[in-house]
């Protein structure tokens, strides 16, 4: 049935007036809390599903999270949080390390978490050229890494590090070359374990469940409007490991439904499992 329009206001405190400015500084009023409006329809038998979305700016998200956690711990805050450069004399009073990279990548690749993927990309830039991380720094770090290992992918364009950019480009042959190289690296087991398993878990849970390939393909999938892709490793019934990359895009001026791309993927994978026989 049609869903009534819902309007949700983020629980981030907003100031009605600006905080006093120090001499020589300009203070701005905190922005009003953003509103998320949801419209559309859904089937009456839809199961519960969680869809993570970040509707706040990074500054609002950080300020709101700090405010909530601080008050939860019994603290109080007077005034408002403003987005500005940290004073030169500021000192870090606490820092926290993330989970190990292989655990982070497992969360990203199994469920196709684009937000986390982008954060890892930005962290790459910060490690390469110092904080704060940026897309420009991250791209430079990636270029250096590829060049040091002898890779040359002229067509490569990584926009924001996630799967939600229509500017990102790579050829299937280039991605296959990279995956073949990665298979012989000492960290290969961690990389493969981070990928969804066909018919078993992650984004591939419901695909090819009752077919021989179920449980034998570790792959990263990606689907947006007019594009459907898979890339990873397949173990055939003769014990051979294959690198498989299939990037399916709509022709100019045409549309591509996700299931159209899936049909191509599944046909290719069945062919491999049948022995990869040429006509």
Give the role of each language-model region.
Residues 1-189:
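A small/polar active-site loop signature that marks catalytic segments
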Residues 121-279:
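Small-residue-rich helix-loop
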């Amino acid at each position: 049935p049609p869903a009534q329009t819902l309007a949700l206001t983020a629980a981030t405190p907003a100031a009605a007036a600006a905080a006093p400015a120090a001499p020589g500084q300009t203070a701005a009023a905190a922005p009003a809390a953003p509103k998320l409006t949801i419209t559309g329809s859904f089937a009456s038998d839809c199961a519960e599903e969680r869809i993570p979305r970040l509707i706040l700016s990074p500054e609002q998200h950080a300020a709101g999270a700090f405010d909530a956690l601080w008050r939860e711990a019994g603290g109080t805050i007077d005034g408002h949080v403003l987005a500005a450069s940290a004073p030169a004399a500021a000192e870090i009073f606490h820092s926290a390390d993330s989970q190990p990279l292989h655990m982070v990548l497992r969360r990203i690749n199994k469920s196709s978490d684009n937000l986390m993927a982008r954060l890892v990309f930005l962290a790459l830039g910060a490690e390469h050229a110092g904080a704060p991380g940026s897309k420009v720094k991250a791209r430079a770090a990636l270029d250096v890494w590829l060049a040091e290992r002898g890779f040359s992918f002229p067509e490569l364009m990584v926009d924001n590090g996630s799967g939600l950019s229509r500017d990102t480009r790579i050829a299937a042959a280039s991605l296959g070359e990279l995956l073949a190289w990665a298979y012989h690296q000492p960290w290969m087991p961690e990389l493969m374990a981070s990928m969804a398993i066909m018919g078993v878990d992650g984004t591939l849970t419901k695909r090819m469940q009752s077919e021989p390939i179920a449980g034998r393909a570790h792959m990263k999938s990606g689907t947006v409007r007019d594009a459907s892709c898979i890339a990873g490793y397949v173990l055939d019934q003769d014990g051979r490991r294959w690198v498989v990359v299939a990037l399916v895009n709509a022709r100019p001026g045409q549309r591509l439904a996700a299931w159209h791309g899936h049909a191509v993927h599944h046909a290719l994978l069945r062919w491999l499992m049948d022995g990869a026989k040429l006509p």
